[in-house]
Regions:
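Residues lining hydrophobic/aromatic ligand-binding pockets adjacent to catalytic sites
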Residues: 1-127
Length: 128
């Protein structure tokens, strides 16, 4: 019998999310459901010397209450430079930063071309 996991997409998936995927035979990305504001779909936290900081992908939500995750458009492509700068500033002295930076930076570069939140989340999930 196959083990299956079904989950909504998250921006920069956390270790538990990756562990869940590794523990099943089939993983289904469930993004054909309603987008929810102030959730992990378009944001995540990083550690900074001042405490945690939210990294949020700006998305179009005004007047789109019933939009699905896979229909949610990114409203400002400048989020990429801001997020990458925050990651660099706060993790450049971390162990293994140089190793991780070499494969993480190209993901942010690829994300520039993606107009939908779901596509960005899928990109990070597939590569991480």
């Amino acid at each position: 019998m196959s083990k299956v996991a079904i989950s909504q997409s998250n921006y920069i998936p956390w270790k538990g999310y990756i562990d869940m995927i590794a523990s099943v035979d089939v993983f289904v990305l469930y993004d054909d459901m309603q987008y929810t504001k102030r959730d992990w779909r378009n944001r995540n936290k990083i550690k900074t010397p001042q405490g945690t900081k939210w990294l949020s992908i700006p998305v179009e939500v005004k007047g789109k209450y019933f939009q699905k995750i896979n229909e949610t458009k990114i409203s400002d492509p400048n989020w990429i430079a801001s997020h990458w700068s925050s990651i660099q500033q706060n993790y450049k002295k971390a162990p293994y930063y140089a190793d991780v930076c070499h494969w993480l930076k190209p993901l942010f570069d690829q994300a520039k071309e993606l107009p939908l939140l779901s596509n960005v989340n899928r990109l990070f999930l597939q590569e991480i």
